[in-house]
């Protein structure tokens, strides 16, 4: 079985993880590279938290295992996974358990200043959560800065276009190199349509 590869895109709220993930997907479709995109926040968005799972990590893992199993059965081996803390060391174990092999993990931490993150959140959080989300975002930025492993690539997002950021992040994966594209198409039974 071909080794699975995961492009982990982490970062504080408002840094652009989801938007960058979708742009990377667009660039990979153009390059005809088979892949899957999953937003980790959606895998654990339940209330209240399941009993015995206050951080919702167990339900995220169960959902990811279920979803990834379907994609893997179809031949997919590359996953773009966006989630705030996905770059932290403890996330690696989840992917190893789910993928059943030693997946190649590429960690990218998107960063933004407090001002930039708050401005982006203000455009997104139109309800009652703006103040809380902004405070949590600042806290997570410091946590990620302190605890991201040494092999994590840090990409600043302030003042840059989504296309520029996504291109830089995608380059870290090596997925668009000529050999990678050929292997992707040849070894995947189902290639997503554009």
Regions found by a protein language model. Name each.
Residues 59-102:
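Glycine-rich phosphate-binding loop used to anchor ATP phosphates in small-molecule kinases
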Residues 126-168, 175-194:
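Small-molecule kinase domains that catalyze NTP-dependent phosphoryl transfer to phosphate-bearing small molecules
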Residues 22-66:
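Conserved substrate/cofactor phosphate-moiety recognition/catalytic segment
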Residues 13:
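The conserved Walker
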Residues 101-122:
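Conserved phosphate-donor/acceptor-positioning beta-strand/loop module used by diverse small-molecule
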Residues 1-4:
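Phosphate-binding P-loop
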Residues 9:
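Hydrophobic anchor at the beta1->P-loop junction of P-loop NTPases
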């Amino acid at each position: 079985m071909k080794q699975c590869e995961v492009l982990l895109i982490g970062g504080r709220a408002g840094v652009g993880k989801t938007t960058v993930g979708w742009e990377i997907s667009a660039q990979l479709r153009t390059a005809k590279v088979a892949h899957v995109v999953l937003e980790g926040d959606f895998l654990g968005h339940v209330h209240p938290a399941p009993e015995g799972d206050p951080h919702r990590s167990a339900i995220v893992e169960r959902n990811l295992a279920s979803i990834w199993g379907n994609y893997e059965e179809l031949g997919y081996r590359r996953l773009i996974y966006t989630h705030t803390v996905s770059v932290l060391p403890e996330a690696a174990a989840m992917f190893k358990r789910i993928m059943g092999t030693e997946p190649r993990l590429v960690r990218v931490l998107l960063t933004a200043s407090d001002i930039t993150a708050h401005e982006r959140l203000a455009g997104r959080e139109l309800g009652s959560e703006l103040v809380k989300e902004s405070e949590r975002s600042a806290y997570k930025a410091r946590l990620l800065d302190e605890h991201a492993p040494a092999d994590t690539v840090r990409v600043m997002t302030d003042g840059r276009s989504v296309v520029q950021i996504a291109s830089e992040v995608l380059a870290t994966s090596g997925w668009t190199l000529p050999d990678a594209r050929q292997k992707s198409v040849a070894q995947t039974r189902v290639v997503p349509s554009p």
